[in-house]
Amino acid sequence: MGKEKFERTKPHVNIGTIGHIDHGKTTLTAAITKIASLKMGSKAVAYDEIDKAPEEKERGITIATAHVEYETTLRHYAHVDCPGHADYIKNMITGAAQMDGAIIVVAATDGPMPQTREHILLARQVGVPSIVVFLNKCDMVDDEELLELVELEVRELLSSYDFPGDDTPVIRGSALKALECDSADDDAAKPILELLDACDSYIPEPERDTDKPFLMPIEDVFSISGRGTVVTGRVERGIIKVGEQIEIVGIKDTMTTTCTGVEMFRKLLDQGQAGDNVGVLLRGVKRDDVERGQVLAAPKSITPHKKFKAEVYVLSKEEGGRHTPFFSGYRPQFYFRTTDITGIIGLEEGVEMVMPGDNATFIVELIHPVAMEQGLRFAIREGGRTVGAGVVSEILE
């Protein structure tokens, strides 16, 4: 049979493999593409193709990531796999590869290891909504009780980071054995099919961007004589319709106004939606009331904050970052959406300093409030040069 064309009718879900080094993430990724190709006729991707993942730049940070895709009867998946531990951390913090769910791979021969823990913690901090477990290398463990023990340990670990450990699907199998299958009906292929079923049923379908509350970061402000003030930007999520009330949030006190017009490419529209670059005409707003760095948002959907906790990756010297460590009290710029805002960094107790190439937890206090929520990404800059990337993990005030 020929290659099926890519059907857009199925819901699209972004997923990725996480877990400790050498526990079998890349082998599992290859096995999934192989079994899915045998069952659905999609393309199989070999281990070495995934392993030599090309390096990409995301906000100036070099990340090696492999992207594969496959289908189940219900969904289309885009799957990311990273060769190195540092790549995972950078990936999750920058949001370079958005994950709607993750498959955590744990070798039954080892049980949970330090990176297993770190990846689960990061998944929690950056807001990965759900995790499915693949217990790998089960063919190398003869003792059923040992498997039970490892499974229990993984469930407890998930629960300790506020994932529902007791309800999480745990699939046992061998990625390597599955990779050797010639048919999707082979016994060794069954765990992979079970895993895909678990992803289908357990990882929720992501909410479409257009269904979320409206938000547009303001890039520019113009005043048009006789018509009023227009702000331009790219709609990040939701839909804005002419006549709707909206808030202007961040930097200054929140203002409420009404959208009296939406235009795109100089044409008037009745609405703008996620992905559109638009100009929004605001009623009764003066040119000086609004500035770049604020956002337009659906009323009560987002609030301005100054103080937050964040997971941050600090660029290494090779990536063009700092050459020296920094300490509590460091004052760089935080680039949120469209603008830089100065903030002061506090390090966690017991952490003396942060070296280039490290990832760390920061407590940040900005000099102006910014419209923010958990999961918001930002860059840390010094004089226009990016020295770090982060994600808001908790709002403090």
Curated annotation (Swiss-Prot):
Organism: Oleidesulfovibrio alaskensis (strain ATCC BAA-1058 / DSM 17464 / G20) (Desulfovibrio alaskensis)
EC number in record: 3.6.5.3
Family: Belongs to the TRAFAC class translation factor GTPase superfamily. Classic translation factor GTPase family. EF-Tu/EF-1A subfamily.
An MF annotation (GO) of this entry: GTP binding
Record's protein name: Elongation factor Tu
Protein residues bound to Mg(2+): 26
Subcellular location: Cytoplasm
Region spans: G2: 60-64
GO (cellular component) term, any one: cytosol
Gene designation per UniProt: tuf
Known catalytic reactions: GTP + H2O = GDP + phosphate + H(+)
Stored SUPFAM superfamilies: EF-Tu/eEF-1alpha/eIF2-gamma C-terminal domain (SSF50465), P-loop containing nucleoside triphosphate hydrolases (SSF52540), Translation proteins (SSF50447)
Domain tr-type G: 10-207
Location of region: G4: 136-139
UniProt region (G3), positions on chain: 81-84
CDD domains linked: EF_Tu (cd01884), EFTU_II (cd03697), EFTU_III (cd03707)
Residues engaged in binding GTP: 19-26, 81-85, 136-139
